[in-house]
């Protein structure tokens, strides 16, 4: 991966009126502090593809369907119990200010890791590019927004 290629592309601008969705636990786990209404895993949990040891990371999607795919389909769930689904909720949010994000969608074809469940590789990529912007945009059917 040549990270210099990111400098050639304009950032993705996430505007304050843009709708974002995520699926999260309806209740926080013991020891996990929410951020407002968001229930985000603590730093170092390494529970998601772009998680980091020193930052809390929140995953959002541009539609409820993409949020569902990211939460359930990407993890290759073959079946989901109703109890499992009842313990989750869909959250709608809008950014409080414009954010400049690194857009990785242009690289999805040449870097299949962006669409994979290979956590170690995507976490390494996230560490390498975290200084480029306030977040990342990765392709997953529709856009998935990763904010750290």
Predicted regions, residues:
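Extended catalytic/binding region for NAD+/ADP-ribose chemistry, centered on the ART fold
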Residues: 47-78
């Amino acid at each position: 991966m040549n990270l210099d290629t990111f400098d050639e592309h304009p950032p993705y601008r996430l505007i304050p009126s843009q709708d974002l969705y995520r699926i999260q636990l309806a209740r926080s786990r013991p020891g996990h502090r929410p951020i407002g209404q968001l229930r985000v895993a603590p730093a170092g949990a390494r529970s998601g593809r772009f998680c980091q040891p020193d930052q809390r990371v929140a995953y959002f999607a541009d539609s409820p369907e993409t949020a569902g795919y990211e939460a359930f389909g990407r993890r290759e769930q073959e079946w989901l119990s109703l109890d499992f689904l009842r313990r989750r909720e869909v959250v709608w949010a809008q950014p409080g200010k414009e954010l400049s994000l690194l857009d990785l969608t242009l690289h999805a074809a040449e870097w299949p890791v962006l669409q994979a469940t290979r956590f170690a590789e995507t976490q390494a990529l996230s560490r390498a590019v975290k200084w480029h912007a306030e977040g990342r945009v990765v392709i997953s059917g529709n856009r998935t927004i990763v904010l750290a």
